Each structure stands twice: as C-alpha cells, then as structure tokens.
C-alpha cells in the first residue's frame, strides 16, 4: 500500500472499503515511528511491518477496522484507552494527557461513537480516528449531548490547526471547520434530553 504524504514528518495509509479498514497515521520522530491505528487490510499490515525503527502504536478505539491488524504487525509499544486495552487484553492505558519526545501528545477524546477513544496531536495536526462521529442506536443516529460538549472543549484546547478524521474525504481538514459542524449540532440540543437526534446518517 502506498503511503500518502501529509508533511515531511507525517504520512498516512488511506482507508479502504473492502475490507473496511481505517486510515493509518504514520509519524516519523527521529529513529522511531508513532502509528495511529493499524487498520484491517493486508496492505496496511505490510506497510507497517515494512517500517524500520522502533514502532509505537496508538489505537483510537476498539472497533476492528482500527485494531484488526494488531496481531499481524510488529511493534514495540502500544497505547490505548482503558476500554480498548481491556478488549484487546494488552497495551498501556492512557487515562490522561501523555507527552513524548518528538512533540507527541496523546489525549482522551470524549466520543459518542466509541467508548474510551484516544487522540494524537503532533505540531499543527491532530489525529481523531472516529472520535467526532455520532453513535447509532436502533437505526437512529445521535450524539450524547454531554459528551459532545466535552468533545468540543477538548478540540478547542488543542494547539493543532488541522484534524485528521478516519473514513472522511478529505482526511485532513481545518480544525475550525470540524468544530463548526460540531457546534452546529450541539446548538440543536434540548436541555431536557440527554441525546441530540440527527435527521440522517
């Protein structure tokens, strides 16, 4: 699978539909790599295994299109939220903000889409996985109003100017553009209701 260059330091392995496989973020920090999600396609696994140097994997959440290759790739360390670590029975749990050499910042991401989501910020870029997306219950798309408010505050606090959201085209967009959409949805809330229902997916 061919890597898609974002900056001199950052690249990605694009998402696929068949099999459903998330975008994989690749950040080069000196002699080591930070890999955000591992996808589920053979192409993503082969590309990750072809990287030279120490490999640190960060999993955005537990869904298989983001974690499916975890047994197929070689790595030195793996970080995820508590729910993902429990689901996979492995990894270092990230419960708060964590900072590493190379400007890597891991942070919990309040998400309606998946419990225990995790983001990765480096410089002007923040990888969010599916963290900004809604949940679906009984065929109805919705956001948890409280979590959506926390998500907006979390994104506002990031220094990043751009966000990268899995399965979305374009993968990269200005943070303010993503925030504008989330604020518009939050403005529809009914203070008496815990969820904000969406008209369509």
Show which residues each predicted segment covers.
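Hydrophobic residues at beta-strand termini and immediately following loops
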Residues: 13, 36, 93-94, 107-109
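Metallo-beta-lactamase
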Residues: 33, 41, 105, 110-199
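Residues that act as N-cap/strand-start positions at coil-to-secondary-structure junctions
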Residues: 19-21, 92-94, 114
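Short glycine/proline-enriched coil/turn segments at helix->beta-strand junctions
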Residues: 30-31, 50-54, 71-77, 102, ...
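Short acidic-hydrophobic surface loop/beta-edge motif
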Residues: 4-6, 27, 94-102
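Active-site HxH/HxHxD metal-binding segment of metal-dependent hydrolases
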Residues: 40-100
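Conserved beta-strand hairpin/beta-sheet module of binuclear metal-dependent hydrolase folds
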Residues: 1-49, 118-135
């Amino acid at each position: 699978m061919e890597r898609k260059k974002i900056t001199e330091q950052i690249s990605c392995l694009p998402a696929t539909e068949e099999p459903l496989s998330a975008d994989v973020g690749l950040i080069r920090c000196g002699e080591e790599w930070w890999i955000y999600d591992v996808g589920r396609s053979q192409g993503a696994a082969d590309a990750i295994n072809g990287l030279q140097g120490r490999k640190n994997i960060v999993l955005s959440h537990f869904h298989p299109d983001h974690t499916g290759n975890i047994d197929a790739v070689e790595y030195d360390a793996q970080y995820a939220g508590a729910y993902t670590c429990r689901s996979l029975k492995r990894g270092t749990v990230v419960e708060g903000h964590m900072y590493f050499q190379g400007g890597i910042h891991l942070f919990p991401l309040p998400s309606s889409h998946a419990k225990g989501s995790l983001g990765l910020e480096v410089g002007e870029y923040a990888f969010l996985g599916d963290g900004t997306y809604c949940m679906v219950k009984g065929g109805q798309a919705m956001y948890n109003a409280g979590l959506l408010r926390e998500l907006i505050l979390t994104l506002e606090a990031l220094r990043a100017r751009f966000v990268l959201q899995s399965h979305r085209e374009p993968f990269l967009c200005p943070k303010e553009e993503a925030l504008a959409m989330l604020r518009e949805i939050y403005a529809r809330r009914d203070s008496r209701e815990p969820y904000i229902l969406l008209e369509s997916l």
